[in-house]
Amino acid sequence: SEMCIRDSVLGKRGKSKNTLLVLTERKTRNEIIFKLPDHTDEAVVAALDRLERKWGADMFKRVFKTITVDNGSEFADAEGLQRSIINEGEKRTKVYYCHPYSSWERGTNEVTNKMIRRKIPKGTNFDDRTEEEVESIENWINGYPRKIHGYHSAGELFEEEVKQLA
């Protein structure tokens, strides 16, 4: 399975320290959304560390074989993104950087960002949003029936994919 870390979604300029990190599974378009304390590479690596602990090292490697990121400074620590927090000295994934200005390489981004913005309008201070609110948005997006999936949700399809990998 291939994962794409997309742009982080920033809160109110100059007001929000917090940001949202959105991971999209390419095949099913399932989203994993993290609220980060700030817009740094350390915060992104810590989010992947949490995800690896949640899934376990072996399952993480199967589900997140590759991760494509843009060239933002929050993704600068390629080594940190790739290294396992569980199995010291091993890689948990392979990171690729997409070409600058090639938004077609991350086409699902705009749709997901619009969906996020329906729940959290542009200019909102993310510092005031709770983890539960972010999780609720993630569940809403993943439960949304999509024409591209024959009106199945990304969440349903992702669950099927994960079962096959187990």
Report the location of each language-model feature:
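Short, flexible loop/turn motifs enriched in small residues
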Residues: 13-19
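Short, surface-exposed basic-aromatic patches at helix termini and helix-loop junctions that form
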Residues: 81-91
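Acidic/histidine-rich, metal-coordinating catalytic segments
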Residues: 58-77, 100-101
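Charged alpha-helix within mobile-element recombinases
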Residues: 92-166
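Short small-residue beta-strand/loop micro-motif enriched in glycine and branched aliphatics
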Residues: 29-34, 122
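Mobile genetic element proteins and their domesticated derivatives, centered on retroelements
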Residues: 7, 23, 29, 48, ...
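Active-site beta-loop-alpha junctions of metal-dependent nucleic acid enzymes
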Residues: 16, 33-58
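Short, small-residue-biased leader/transition segments that mark boundaries at the very start
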Residues: 2-5
